[in-house]
Curated annotation (Swiss-Prot):
UniProt keyword annotation of Coiled coil present: no
InterPro entries in the record: RNase_HII/HIII, RNase_HII/HIII_dom, RNase_HIII, RNase_HIII_N, RNaseH-like_sf, RNaseH_sf, TBP_dom_sf
Primary subcellular site in the record, as a coarse category: cytoplasm
Essential cofactor(s): Mn(2+); Mg(2+)
Xref: Gene3D superfamilies: Ribonuclease H-like superfamily/Ribonuclease H, TATA-Binding Protein
Role played: Endonuclease that specifically degrades the RNA of RNA-DNA hybrids.
Entry's EC annotation: 3.1.26.4
Protein name (database record): Ribonuclease HIII
Lineage: Bacteria, Bacillati, Bacillota, Bacilli, Bacillales
Species annotation: Listeria monocytogenes serovar 1/2a (strain ATCC BAA-679 / EGD-e)
Keywords assigned by UniProt, alphabetized: Cytoplasm, Endonuclease, Hydrolase, Magnesium, Metal-binding, Nuclease
Family: Belongs to the RNase HII family. RnhC subfamily.
PANTHER family referenced in this protein's UniProt entry, alphabetically: RIBONUCLEASE, RIBONUCLEASE H2 SUBUNIT A
């Protein structure tokens, strides 16, 4: 399970120690000044002023402190997995997220978006939040309102290009890294000379792996980059990026459905196999490849359905 680590100042570390005293664990790991366990989360504070949250409720617990901590006088490491500076939620940040990676039909879609502190109240009023529970109509309604307000860049990897790259040996993580890096670079160019205080990527790979994927890129964004899972809940920029990415993904999906003349389903379950088999029967395997990620198991399952 992923860990969330935040960097705090000394007074806050002492405050956390007192707050978690009723849940304290007497067994301290090396370098720790306190340890506690609550339902769904273990918390460990270290002499280095780093505090680690582990467990299913770890990120939610950490977020309480990230959102309320005073600004730390010490500068946090600019590129560190899982370490977010104090008061991160109110900083001016470029956030990036992607959709479509687990869908048999449709492109991978990545969006990077910049949100500053002044824009946050309006975005919240317009409904920007963690979008996982939102239905497509709500996503589209909010996206159309915020896109003129938020500097952003959306990049799609269409299915034919995806299949070409995959056959050349590129995995999905590499594709996502390239798209995130370029989308972030695009937003930085739009903002110049303004610079964000940080860049937050919704984490899909370890930091070292992410940068290894980008090794051959002529321009690699490294300064003030942070990685976190469930980053939509850590900064509005990622929530906005997720909403815009999903909006563009839905648009692409609708266009493909109209083009092929069949409503295309999302996901990669059995319901997807049946539609894929119908496309093979009516138009052939080459047509299916135009709209799908060919290496998914759905391709073989659909072929077996056709042969029965």
């Amino acid at each position: 399970m992923a860990n969330t680590v935040i960097l705090v100042d000394q007074p806050t570390l002492e405050k956390m120690k007192q707050t978690y005293l009723p849940f304290s664990n007497p067994k301290l790991p090396p370098g720790a000044v306190f340890a506690a366990k609550k339902p769904g989360v273990s918390i460990t504070g270290y002499k280095s002023r780093k505090v680690m949250f582990q467990g299913v409720n770890g990120e939610a617990e950490a977020k309480k402190w990230v959102a309320t901590l005073p600004e730390s006088k010490a500068k946090a490491p600019s590129v560190s997995k899982g370490i977010l500076p104090a008061n991160f939620a109110s900083k001016n940040v470029i956030g990036s997220d992607e959709v479509g990676t687990g869908d048999f039909f449709g492109p991978i879609t990545v969006c990077a978006a910049y949100v500053d502190a002044e824009m946050m109240p309006l975005l919240k009023e317009l409904g920007v939040k963690d979008s996982k529970a939102m239905k497509d109509p709500e996503i589209c309604r909010i996206a159309e309102k915020i896109m003129p307000l938020v500097p952003h860049s959306v990049l799609l990897c269409p299915n034919p290009k995806y299949n070409e790259l995959q056959k050349r040996g590129m995995n999905q993580g590499q594709m996502k890294a390239l798209l995130h890096n370029r989308a972030i670079e695009n937003v930085l160019k739009k903002l110049a000379p303004i610079k964000p205080e940080a860049i937050l990527i919704d984490q899909f790979a370890e930091k070292n792996t992410y940068y290894r994927y980008l090794a051959k890129e002529p321009s690699i964004i490294r300064e003030d980059v942070f990685f976190a899972t469930k980053a939509e809940g850590l900064h509005l920029s990622v929530a906005a990026a997720s909403i815009i990415a999903r909006y563009k993904f839905v648009q692409a999906f609708d266009a493909m459905s109209k083009e092929v003349g069949i409503p295309l389903p999302k996901g990669a379950g059995p319901h997807v196999d049946a539609v894929a088999a119908e496309i093979i029967e009516r138009f052939g395997l080459e047509t299916l490849a135009k709209y799908t990620k060919q290496h998914f198991a759905n391709t073989e399952k659909a072929l077996k359905m056709v042969k029965k």
